[in-house]
Amino acid sequence: MNKKTRKIVFVGLYIALAVVLQYVSGLIPFLQMPNGGNIDLGVIPVLMASYQFGYKTGIFTGLLCWLINLVLGISGSWFVSIPQYLFDYILPVSLLGLASAFPKIGKINNIYTGVTGAMILKYLSHVLSGVYYWFPETTY
């Protein structure tokens, strides 16, 4: 099999796996938080794609996962404003693809630093989304 064909097939498999895991994690009650949010299993295939093919393909895989979840209605998106939607839904999934871009620190393998760094970036993106949603009310 050609390298490009192999890459396309694997990215398709990672996207399909991410969509299925996102759907399944929405069905499992103990993964749902009482005040909103959940533990998302769909991030695992995006991280795997990033480490197998590099951060550019990881970002692309994350964006396609978001798009397919949006089309299928799995993600349960909540639109308030464009910056809020960008920072809460599009950017976090894309930032997961950056996991392979984090370097090795000392004796710590770059998988640990990459996954931790990508999850911190994802968290910061959600925090910025909250700022865009809650901050305008307190400015008056």
Where are each of the predicted segments found?
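Loop-helix junctions at membrane interfaces
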Residues: M1-Y140
